[in-house]
Amino acid sequence: MRVSDFSFDLPEALIARYPKAERTASRLMTLNGNSGAITDGVFTDIVAQLNSGDLLVFNNTRVIPARMFGQKASGGKIEVLVERVIDQNTALAHIRASKSPKVGNELFLGNEDSDVKVKATMVARHGALFELKFNSDESVLTILDKIGHMPLPPYIDRPDEDSDKERYQTVYNEKPGAVAAPTAGLHFDEALLERIKAKGVELAFVTLHVGAGTFQPVKVDEIADHIMHAEYVEVSDEVVAQIAKTKAAGGRVVAVGTTSVRSLESAAKAALDKNKPLSAFYGDTDIFITPGCQFQIIDALVTNFHLSESTLLMLVSAFSGYDHIMSAYQHAISQEYRFFSYGDAMFLTKQELIKQDTP
């Protein structure tokens, strides 16, 4: 398949630049992966979509304030986006500058209106990423909490605000490390989670630290030629046991967000590659899910609306069928659903592989 097969035109007005006042106030489109039937509703309808005995799997990563501004020793302005924290004093980062820093160059980071300035040294380059060593007694995460900005996606196209520190974060976040939110989870508040649990639905938590690569455009013509960026994943023994218990009792595994899908399916792929049953998985994944892929664990999916020609649009097309997804997106545009990170959501059921449709 070609990347252009996943293209659609989106009116600018449908890009959500701010969240709804209430987390649960978004709309919810339900798509049946087998029939293609679409139902329009509100996000709290998800309670009715879930059954007692289902397992709802969330990504508990915490978004770090990964964007920093500053200058080089020469005075040139720079923008730094931390991609991954390596240790207490070291991070890999993307750097925007008129001229890229060289090994040994010092960077001075901090807001113009603040007295807090931190010095970092560029110690190595790894492809598009720069390895920075922070010259401070404080950890990288502490430094980011002091001078960092929430790394809003480029399509939100506005400076971050104080409200984003709460709203570009799930209510159940636990493990810091992401530079983008697992956005399907933004629709849940504590009250909705309690309603879901009261129905007999069990909750499980995996970790995938979302990297900035999630926003990188696919730069090849054929999707088979695309190389995915790697992200760190944790799927615990406890989650593996919850999945086994759910499947044995006839329940469904429902992933909240494509990051939860990629976490669980990465663990399943690792087990399959070893010809062993599902087990805990800790490590990097570069899994790329496209139409024709067979899902080992996931039965249903909660997800936001994704960018044209993105790997995430390819993933949901693999899950619910290419034709069904592309038709659903046209329906969403005609009904003026809000798109992307702060936008509305979908509840998708899986299309059986024998009915998989690809162009």
From Swiss-Prot:
One cellular component (GO) term of this entry: cytoplasm
UniProt KW Lipid metabolism keyword: no
Single annotated GO MF: S-adenosylmethionine:tRNA ribosyltransferase-isomerase activity
UniProt cross-references to InterPro entries, sorted A to Z: QueA, QueA_dom1, QueA_dom2, QueA_sf
Pathway given in the UniProt record: tRNA modification; tRNA-queuosine biosynthesis
SUPFAM superfamilies assigned: QueA-like
EC number(s) reported in the record: 2.4.99.17
Source organism superkingdom: Bacteria
Bilayer-crossing regions: none
BP-aspect Gene Ontology terms: queuosine biosynthetic process; tRNA wobble guanine modification
Annotated compartments: Cytoplasm
Keywords recorded for this protein, A-Z: Cytoplasm, Queuosine biosynthesis, S-adenosyl-L-methionine, Transferase
Pfam families: Queuosine_synth
Catalytic activity field: 7-aminomethyl-7-carbaguanosine(34) in tRNA + S-adenosyl-L-methionine = epoxyqueuosine(34) in tRNA + adenine + L-methionine + 2 H(+)
Record's function text: Transfers and isomerizes the ribose moiety from AdoMet to the 7-aminomethyl group of 7-deazaguanine (preQ1-tRNA) to give epoxyqueuosine (oQ-tRNA).
Subunit structure: Monomer.
NCBIfam families: PRK00147.1, queA
Family of this protein: Belongs to the QueA family.
Designated name of the protein: S-adenosylmethionine:tRNA ribosyltransferase-isomerase
Species this protein is from: Colwellia psychrerythraea (strain 34H / ATCC BAA-681) (Vibrio psychroerythus)
Species lineage: Bacteria, Pseudomonadati, Pseudomonadota, Gammaproteobacteria, Alteromonadales
Gene: queA
